[in-house]
From Swiss-Prot:
SUPFAM superfamilies in the cross-refs: Ribosomal protein S19
Disulfide bond positions: none
Keywords: Ribonucleoprotein, Ribosomal protein, RNA-binding, rRNA-binding
Protein name: Small ribosomal subunit protein uS19
Keyword Glycoprotein appears in the UniProt entry: no
Entries under HAMAP family matching the protein: Ribosomal_uS19
Species this protein is from: Listeria monocytogenes serovar 1/2a (strain ATCC BAA-679 / EGD-e)
One of the record's GO cellular component terms: small ribosomal subunit
Recorded superkingdom: Bacteria
Gene Ontology biological-process annotations: ribosomal small subunit assembly; translation
Recorded family membership: Belongs to the universal ribosomal protein uS19 family.
Protein purpose: Protein S19 forms a complex with S13 that binds strongly to the 16S ribosomal RNA.
Length: 92
């Protein structure tokens, strides 16, 4: 289920302040955040946001087609190492 339309999208206040300050200063700096639950707004476009995945901060460059999605969608938390390989010796 998605979020109710009457509530509107959610962004943590501290993240919004950091993005607005970065937009005013016009410097290309990476914004660190732990807020994976925040929705990407149009003001985020062009910014690089380092999203925490539980181990490290993953840099995410925000593009126009990402607007409306959550930051956590672009920083996977699990590493997939693949299935076990075929063991030729045990098949015989």
């Amino acid at each position: 289920m998605g979020r109710s339309l009457k509530k509107g999208p959610f962004v943590d206040d501290h993240l919004m302040k950091k993005v607005e300050a970065a937009a005013e200063s016009e410097k290309k700096q990476v914004i660190k955040t732990w807020s994976r639950r925040s929705t990407i707004f149009p003001t985020f476009v062009g910014q690089t946001i380092a999203v925490y995945d539980g181990r490290k901060h993953v840099p995410v460059y925000v593009q126009e087609d990402m607007v409306g999605h959550k930051l956590g969608e672009f920083a996977p938390t699990r590493t997939y190492r693949g299935h076990a390989g075929d063991d030729k010796k045990t098949k015989r």
